[in-house]
Swiss-Prot record:
Transmembrane segments: 4-24
Organism: Acidianus bottle-shaped virus (isolate Italy/Pozzuoli)
Protein name: Uncharacterized protein ORF53b
Entry keyword set: Host membrane, Membrane, Transmembrane, Transmembrane helix
Major localisation: host cell
Compartments where found: Host membrane
A GO CC annotation given for this chain: host cell membrane
Lineage: superkingdom: Viruses
Membrane topology: Single-pass membrane protein
Length: 53
């Protein structure tokens, strides 16, 4: 019986780890996209201020 409980606990932990990993990957991809957009906006602002000068 103890082994069965350990098996269930291990399964839950494993599923949680996989879920956590997929969420982590999603967040990392979103962060990269966000940084790309941010850098594009910064270069745009920079060009506009140069034109203004």
């Amino acid at each position: 019986m103890e082994n069965f409980i350990l098996l269930i606990v291990g399964f839950i932990y494993g599923a949680g780890g996989v879920l956590l990993y997929s969420v982590y990957k999603e967040v990392r991809e979103m962060k990269q996209i966000f940084e790309q957009i941010l850098s594009q906006m910064q270069t745009k602002d920079y060009e506009e201020t140069n034109d203004f000068m």
